[in-house]
Amino acid sequence: MANNPIPVYVFTGFLESGKTKFIQEILADPNFTENEVTTLLLCEEGIEEYDEKWLAHYGTALVPIESEDRLTPNILKRIEQKYNPDRIIVEYNGMWKLESLMQAFPARWELYQIITTV
């Protein structure tokens, strides 16, 4: 398992376009989260917020990333080591360059999907 890729799902879009709600619906879907650990990187805060107890029920750890300069390979690798996720979901800040995130991916992180809400 140590060498298996970790799928990364990136949600991007305008502020208040429904990213958080959409992610919550996906996490609540048993076909998506069955017995797997998810790390949710939160790169922006809108009106809709996550309840950490609710997330824990679905095997999800919330990790805030408060600025684009915190997207470094070292920081993301430490997150991977700390949480040992089966998958990573990123609620990305639409004002940040997507390239910043992609260039910071540790070796095992593999982009599976980019979802844009409007």
Regions found by a protein language model. Give the residues of each.
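Nucleotide-state-sensitive switch-loop elements of NTP-binding domains
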Residues: 2-12, 16-17, 21-118
